[in-house]
Amino acid sequence: MFNIPITKPDLGEEEKQLISQVIESGWVSQGPKVAEFEEIFARYVGARHAVATTSCTTALHAALSVSGIGPGDEVIVPSLSFIATANSVLYCGATPVFVDVDPETCNIDVQKIEETVTRKTRAIMPVHQMGLPADLDPIKKIAEKNKLLIIEDAACAIGSAYENTKIGGHGNIACFSFHPRKIITTGEGGMITADDPTIAERLRRFRHHGMSVSDIERHMANSVIIETYPELGYNYRMTDMQAAMGIGQMKKLSFLLDARKQMARMYDNELGKIPHIRIPQVPSYARHNYQSYWIELLASAPVDRNTLMAKLLEKGIATRRGIMAIHRELCYQAYAGIYLPNTDRLTDNTLLLPLYPALSAEEQTFIINSIKEIFKQ
């Protein structure tokens, strides 16, 4: 009997040694390792600045806040996303405005963005869903035409690229996640990339209670520094222990991406032959990191999505629903009446399959054969 989880972080001796070094140094809160991790990350994606946080959720909140988003403002977001996308807008007192997605990519429908812009719109928040880049060029044109900000929810998108430029390197603010289900992990954690030095500096203060000076600056100063608090902030600081793990993870990122791509290709080749299943489509402008692998059950499928998930679990195979429709959750009941047909169909009929480097060929073959077997019953 197999016991196959939906994902498994790839952690080993290197991460263990790096974390041990931090413990031995005595500096376990935010310090030099966070700064090192930020530098490595910024260089990798091609951004001028990277600012580490406690999660992608806090990264999104910080990015919106320092961008001046607040009460009376609207931010255009896809409903087909993890709930943190819209929650971060509400945290600022602003209003999320939900739009539908492209049914082929599960990413925000560019045409719907154009139709949704009002005089209250301040920003567009495209989500690179499951690691597949959104179509950024037309979104940028809409933003420039209407003088809007773009803040990318890149939670899943490390290593993905749009038009051969990595996500995070397109000049917009972009927010990444290091949750254990992502390509690399720091346990919990996030990162914001930006090119504007003023925005980057404000983000660093925002994550540190709005304080005028960092712990490193005080530690390295030759004289006493009395800090000030020029603006409201939060404690969104990543620790050096987490950053050490992240540094170790960045060293193996290329391997992790290659392994996922190979496994996704195997799923494509086998599941793409089943007439009841639609597999992910990757546009020519995108390089997909396959943070997750999703399939959609078509109307012709002999079982529904939930039944398939239950039968796979009986065989020891964990799955997850594809993506939530935020507007259908109880805390967003004020949006319950909006019509987003692609979002509704995808949230009801998609599921995520196990995908991680430690997944063996035998286990992946078992997953594929189990789906085929269930469809024949």
Features from the language model and the residues they span:
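Phosphate-binding glycine-rich loop
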Residues: 27-74, 88-92, 98-100, 165
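Glycine-/small-residue-rich active-site loops that bind phosphorylated ligands and cofactors
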Residues: 11, 29, 81, 104-105, ...
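N-terminal "arm"/small-domain region of PLP-dependent enzymes with the aminotransferase-like
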Residues: 1-27, 32, 228-230, 354
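PLP-dependent aminotransferase-like
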Residues: 65-154, 161
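PLP-dependent aminotransferase class I/II
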Residues: 35-39, 47-50, 111, 123-127, ...
